Amino acid sequence: VGCAECPMHCKGKMAKPTCENEVCKCNIGKKD
């Protein structure tokens, strides 16, 4: 998932969205 979609992608999950190298990750201790 790209940076632009990251906040919506991670919404509703107990996660903090972060973006590295144009890749979205929802940090829950695991990489998404």
From Swiss-Prot:
Has the structural arrangement of an alpha-helix connected to a beta-sheet by disulfide bonds (CSalpha/beta). This is Potassium channel toxin alpha-KTx 9.4. Expressed by the venom gland. One of its GO terms (molecular function) is potassium channel regulator activity. Keywords: Disulfide bond, Ion channel impairing toxin, Neurotoxin, Potassium channel impairing toxin, Secreted, Toxin, Voltage-gated potassium channel impairing toxin. Belongs to the short scorpion toxin superfamily. Potassium channel inhibitor family. Alpha-KTx 09 subfamily. It is found in: Secreted. It comes from Hottentotta tamulus. The keyword Transmembrane does not apply. GO terms for cellular component: extracellular region. Blocker of human voltage-gated potassium channel Kv1.1/KCNA1. It comes from the Eukaryota. InterPro entries: Scorpion_toxin-like_sf, Toxin_alpha-KTx_8/9. Disulfide bonds join 3-19, 6-24, 10-26.
